[in-house]
A protein has these predicted regions:
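Acidic beta-strand-to-loop metal/phosphate-binding motif
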Residues: 73-86, 387
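Secondary-structure capping and boundary motifs in well-ordered enzyme cores
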Residues: 52-55, 85, 122, 247, ...
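Active-site-adjacent structural elements in folded domains
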Residues: 238-243, 251-254, 334-339, 347-359, ...
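Glycine/tryptophan-enriched, flexible segments
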Residues: 123-334, 338, 449, 453, ...
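N-terminal beta-strand-loop-alpha-helix module at the start
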Residues: 1-63, 540
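Contiguous, well-ordered alpha-helical segments that form the cores/surfaces of helical PPI scaffolds
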Residues: 253-257, 268, 298, 351-354, ...
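Structural beta-alpha unit
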Residues: 61-67, 95, 99
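Active/binding-pocket-proximal capping segment
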Residues: 311, 317-322, 383-432
C-alpha cells in the first residue's frame, strides 16, 4: 500500500503547538509532507489590507488541482475557517480534491469550540451574547486541552511547479494606493532567493511596514509566558479598567494579532490563564477577564458562522437594526450583498468621514487614536470604542460599515467576525442597545490621561500645547497657540499649512444630541436589515427628513458629556479585543467593490426576530 503523500495547507494557523489539523496530517505517517502557504489573491487584491498586516501568487482554487497532479498528492489537510469567503474558497478546493481522488481532512482549531457546533447547539441561531455562547458551549463540554507541538516534521519530496500559472483577476485592487511597484510573484516554492525565508515587503512590491509590533510563534509564546508569570495581572485583569492612553508598553496583552494569524493557539491561551485564575483568590471573571475576551471572540465567530455573508452588513441581516446612517452602502441587485461602494447623501458627512480616517477631525483624542491605528495597526479596545462611537451614533451619524472597512484595512489583528461584531456593537446596531451612552472626545480621554501625553505622542503638532488646552486646542488664546508653535485653522485636508492643526469638525454637544434623538427614532421604528421597508427604500416614509442632520459649528465652546457608567448584563459588557494614510482620498474609493462581503452566495429569506 502506498504511504500517504500529504499537503498541509497553512492559513490562519501559523504555529506548530496545539494544531489539531497538523496533528491529523502527521498521524497519517506520510512518506512525503508538504507544508504550504499561498498568497491568496483575494487577500492581496479584494480584501483591504494595509502595510502593517503584510509580513507564488495564484488562487488556491486553481493552484491546488495542479499540485495534486504534479506531486501525486493523496491527502490535503487544513484547519477549519468559518469566515464567509473562506467557506466559499474551501468548498471549491474540497470539491477539486475529491475530483482528483485526494482525501480532505479538516479539523477545528481556530476557536475554543467549533463555531458550527456552537450554532447547532444554539438552535441554528447566531450567538448574540456570551451567556448564549456559554450555554451552547456547555452542551459541547469543556474546552479541549491543547496538544503539544510535534518534535519533528517529515521532509518534503520533490516540488515541481512546471505547469502554467493561472493569473488571478487583479481588479478591483483595494491595495493599489499603497503599492510602490507592480505586484510580484515568484515560481519557486523556496521563494525569490531560494532560502524559504519570509518575503520582505519590498519583495512583494510594497514599502516597509510602520508597525513596531512583530509576529511569529516564538514571540507569541514568549509574550504569553511573560503575561502568565505575572499572576496578579493575569488573574485580576479587567479590560474596562485598562487605559487606552497607555503606550510603550500598552495596558493590555497585545496577543490579539497572534490569535488572528494563529501564531498563538486560543486553547493554549485559555488554559494557561485558567490554571492561574483557578488558583488565585479574588480573580476577575467574564466578561471583563482575559477569559471573557476569548469568549467574546468565540461569540462573534459563531454569529458569523450562523449568518454567513449577511452578518457583515445591515442589508438582509435579520439581527442588525436598520438605522438610516449617512454614507450608506450600495448593494448588488442580484445578490443583495453590499458592494463596497457607498452613496454620498451628504457632502459634509463625506468630508467628516475623510477627516476621521485621516486623523484630522480637530478633536485631538480621536485624531491621536486614528493615527496610532494607521501607523501601528493596533489601538486599545477603549480607543476603538471612542473612534467608532464618534463616527456613528455619537457624532457623525455615518454608517458603521464605513468604519468597519477602515479597520479591515489597518488592523493587524483584524478578524472579520470580530471587526464586524464590534462595529455593530459600538454603533448600537446589534449586540448592544444603550445608544445614549456616548464617549466624549474630550472628557473620556482626560479621564485616563489628564496631561495629554498620548496626544503629544501621536499628534506632534500639539506636543508643546499647554495641558489646559491639549484636548480642546481651539479654546487656546492666540498667544498660547503661538507659544505652542501651532495655529488652529483649516480642515486638515485642503491647503494645509505647516504648523497648523485643524478646527473641530462640529460642536460635539449638539451633534451628540442630534444623534441620540435620531437613534431614538430608529429604535421606535424598529426595522431590521431584512425588513422589506429597509430594503426597498420605503423606510423614508417612517423617518423625519432631518434624521441625523448634518450641521457643523466649529467656533463655539461647548460642554462635554463623559461616558455614563451604568451596566446591565450583556448591554454594557465590553467586547473582545480582536475587534479591525493621512493622504486625502479621491472619489475612486467610492467605486471599489469589497469582496469581503460580495459573493454569488444566495441571500437567505427574511426571518422574523
Amino acid at each position: 500500500m502506498v504511504k500517504p503523500r500529504v499537503i498541509y495547507w497553512f492559513r490562519t494557523d501559523l504555529r506548530l503547538h496545539d494544531s489539531p489539523a497538523l496533528k491529523a496530517a502527521l498521524d497519517l505517517d506520510p512518506s512525503v509532507f508538504w507544508p504550504i502557504f499561498t498568497w491568496d489573491p483575494h487577500y492581496v487584491y479584494r480584501a483591504r489590507g494595509g502595510l502593517n498586516r503584510w509580513q507564488f501568487l495564484e488562487a488556491p482554487q486553481t493552484l491546488f488541482p495542479k499540485l495534486f497532479k504534479a506531486w501525486k498528492v493523496t491527502h490535503i489537510v487544513f484547519e477549519k475557517d468559518t469566515d464567509s469567503y473562506a467557506r466559499e474558497r474551501d468548498s471549491i478546493v474540497t470539491q477539486a480534491a475529491k475530483d482528483a481522488g485526494v482525501e480532505v481532512i479538516i479539523r477545528s482549531g481556530r476557536t475554543l469550540w467549533d463555531s458550527d457546533q456552537i450554532v447547532e447547539k444554539h438552535g441554528g441561531k447566531p450567538t448574540m451574547s456570551i451567556t448564549q455562547l456559554q450555554a451552547a458551549g456547555s452542551k459541547l463540554g469543556q474546552v479541549k486541552k491543547p496538544i503539544p507541538a510535534p518534535k519533528n516534521l517529515p521532509d518534503p519530496g520533490d516540488m515541481p511547479v512546471n505547469f502554467d500559472q493561472d493569473e488571478p483577476d487583479t481588479k478591483p485592487d483595494f491595495n493599489s494606493e499603497i503599492r510602490t511597484e507592480g505586484d510580484k510573484t515568484y515560481t519557486k516554492i523556496s521563494g525569490p532567493k531560494g532560502d524559504f525565508a519570509i518575503e520582505t515587503m519590498e519583495e512583494l512590491g510594497f514599502p516597509p511596514a510602520t508597525t513596531p509590533h512583530r509576529g511569529g510563534e516564538t514571540l507569541a509564546l514568549k509574550a504569553l509566558d511573560e503575561i502568565i508569570a505575572d499572576k496578579k495581572y493575569t488573574a485580576t485583569f479587567q479590560k474596562p479598567k485598562t487605559s487606552p492612553a497607555q503606550f510603550e508598553p500598552q495596558a493590555t496583552t497585545l496577543l490579539s494579532p497572534h490569535l488572528h494569524f494563529g501564531s498563538l493557539s486560543v486553547r493554549e491561551f485559555y488554559w494557561r490563564v485558567k490554571d492561574v485564575v483557578d488558583s488565585y483568590k479574588g480573580a476577575s471573571s467574564p466578561p471583563e477577564s482575559l477569559i471573557g475576551q476569548l469568549l467574546f471572540r468565540d461569540m462573534y465567530f459563531a454569529a458569523q458562522a450562523a449568518l454567513g455573508y449577511v452578518f457583515s452588513q445591515t442589508a438582509n441581516n435579520p439581527y442588525c437594526r436598520f438605522i438610516p446612517w449617512h454614507l450608506p452602502s450600495k448593494r448588488d441587485p442580484e445578490t443583495g450583498l453590499v458592494t463596497g461602494e457607498y452613496h454620498v447623501d451628504s457632502e459634509e458627512a463625506d468630508i467628516w468621514f475623510k477627516r476621521w480616517k485621516a486623523g484630522m477631525t480637530g478633536f485631538p483624542w480621536i485624531d491621536a487614536l486614528m493615527r496610532q491605528l494607521k501607523d501601528e495597526g493596533w489601538i486599545h479596545h477603549l480607543g476603538r470604542h471612542a473612534v467608532a462611537c464618534f463616527l456613528t451614533r455619537g457624532g457623525c451619524y455615518i454608517d458603521w460599515e464605513r468604519g468597519c472597512e477602515v479597520f479591515e484595512e489597518w488592523l493587524i489583528d483584524h478578524e472579520p467576525a470580530c471587526n464586524v461584531g464590534n462595529w455593530q456593537w459600538l454603533s448600537c446596531s446589534a449586540f448592544f442597545s444603550q445608544y445614549f451612552r456616548c464617549y466624549s472626545p474630550v472628557a473620556f480621554g482626560q479621564k485616563w490621561d489628564k496631561k495629554g501625553e498620548f496626544i503629544r505622542r501621536y499628534v506632534p503638532e500639539l506636543k508643546n500645547m499647554d495641558a489646559k488646552y491639549i484636548y480642546e486646542p481651539w479654546k487656546a488664546p492666540l498667544t498660547d497657540q503661538k507659544k505652542a508653535g501651532v495655529r488652529v485653522k483649516g480642515d486638515g485636508l485642503n491647503n494645509v499649512e505647516e504648523g497648523t492643526y485643524p478646527k473641530p469638525m462640529f460642536d460635539f454637544a449638539k451633534r451628540r444630541d442630534v444623534c441620540i434623538s435620531s437613534m431614538k427614532v430608529a429604535y421606535q421604528v424598529g426595522l431590521h436589515g431584512n425588513d422589506g421597508q429597509a430594503l426597498d427604500g420605503t423606510w423614508r416614509k417612517l423617518f423625519p427628513t432631518d434624521r441625523g442632520e448634518v450641521q457643523g459649528d466649529v467656533e463655539s465652546g461647548y460642554g462635554e458629556h463623559a461616558d455614563e457608567e451604568g451596566k446591565s448584563d450583556n448591554e454594557a459588557k465590553e467586547e473582545g479585543e480582536g475587534t479591525s494614510s493621512v493622504k486625502k482620498e479621491d472619489d475612486t474609493t467610492k467605486g471599489k467593490r469589497s469582496a469581503r462581503r460580495h459573493s454569488t452566495e444566495k441571500v437567505p429569506k427574511k426571518k422574523k426576530v
